[in-house]
């Protein structure tokens, strides 16, 4: 077998994540999937927490592409596009939201975070406002992903069990259909635009 490297460990762990979810993911079964003894894995990931942190970082590196503003992009468009890209990256993998929850920027992400803050400060926000804007939208996006993925998992369980049809009132019937129609995309964009509109008000009131 060729020499094991961390990239292979993470790639195989991501495949396994889609198969078993975060609860079923262990360093033991990652080692089994790769075909090595568990102690060999410890050269690259010391424990499950280190494995999850590495997975979170890799998911963003591979799939979160709109991390910095494009030339002439407005701060509103950047926040919107950044959040959409972040959400899409987390939805690429089973339990992607849970994998990311609780993490902080790694050293490789420091410069990106610095440039994001500087961009918002240059747009007129104070540093604290820039921090709150970025963190609030990130937390909302993560919450949206967690809710979407939990709904997907619970829906799979419901489909395994025969249940009686529930008779909803007319408006609630339509509301359920709306919420189930597009994986939560429209609801996410609606609230995201509300948040950005609120930030526009904050910026205007500061002038």
Curated annotation (Swiss-Prot):
The induction text for this entry reads: By the [Mg-tetracycline]+ complex.
GO biological process terms, semicolon-separated: negative regulation of DNA-templated transcription; response to antibiotic
KW Lyase (keyword) present:
no
Give start and end residues of each DNA-binding region.
Answer: 26-45
Q: Where is the HTH tetR-type domain?
A: 3-63
Positions contributing to Mg(2+) binding: 100
- PROSITE patterns for the chain: HTH_TETR_1, HTH_TETR_2
Extract the InterPro entries matched here: DNA-bd_HTH_TetR-type_CS, Homeodomain-like_sf, HTH-type_TetR-like_transc_reg, HTH_TetR, Repressor_TetR_C, Tet_transcr_reg_TetR, Tet_transcr_reg_TetR-rel_C_sf
Q: Which residues bind tetracycline?
A: 64, 82
Q: Which domain of life is it from?
A: Bacteria
Print the keywords alphabetically: Antibiotic resistance, DNA-binding, Magnesium, Metal-binding, Plasmid, Repressor, Transcription, Transcription regulation
* Molecular functions per Gene Ontology: DNA-binding transcription factor activity; metal ion binding; transcription cis-regulatory region binding
What the protein does comes down to: TetR is the repressor of the tetracycline resistance element; its N-terminal region forms a helix-turn-helix structure and binds DNA. Binding of tetracycline to TetR reduces the repressor affinity for the tetracycline resistance gene (tetA) promoter operator sites.
Q: Which PANTHER family match?
A: HTH-TYPE TRANSCRIPTIONAL REGULATOR RUTR (PTHR30055), TRANSCRIPTIONAL REGULATORY PROTEIN (PTHR30055:SF151)
Q: Give the protein's recorded name.
A: Tetracycline repressor protein class H
Species source reads Pasteurella multocida
Encoding gene per record: tetR
